[in-house]
């Protein structure tokens, strides 16, 4: 009898899967987008020549996103970068976060627009900003993330200046001091 009941349920399984598949297809029909729609995409590697500053008690009230901020004394580096890894080992950091103190940092980069960008959508694509992150362009906050293991796209288009330099500023924080299952790192890491 037990074998008959199991066989009966196994026969019904494909019916349930088929019904669920049909329900999914009704809700989200496939859209065919011709490849030529993507032919005009241009990718620019933006990883080099960033400025970085760790937030400290002395500078924590600074408007790091301001386009007029003098960042000439900041450290120049290339991305990806993990600022928490550079911090000293400390017991107060807690074992759950790799014995590193929680901290915040800012990245900045100035750039002119390419004349070919005018009239086009310009996206800055981050693979990950750990752990919390905000992106500013010319002093305006344009994107945020509260989970660094997912990518973040920041649409620069409405905020770009085509007449001069643009300043992108990225805030990254390792988040509040609380438990974690592993060392998370901090910064623009991919």
Ranges and model annotations:
Residues 1-22:
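Bacterial Sec-dependent N-terminal signal peptides
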Residues 18, 45, 73-78, 84, ...:
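Ser/Thr- (and often Asn-) enriched beta-sheet segments in non-cytosolic proteins
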Residues 21-37, 44, 53-55, 97, ...:
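Accessory beta-strand-rich segments of carbohydrate-active enzymes
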Residues 37-56, 62, 66-81:
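Mature N-terminal segment immediately following signal peptide/propeptide cleavage
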Residues 61, 85-88, 135, 179:
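Generic domain-boundary/flexible-linker signal
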Residues 77, 81-99:
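Surface-exposed, low-complexity/disordered Ser/Thr/Gly/Pro/Asn-rich loops and linkers
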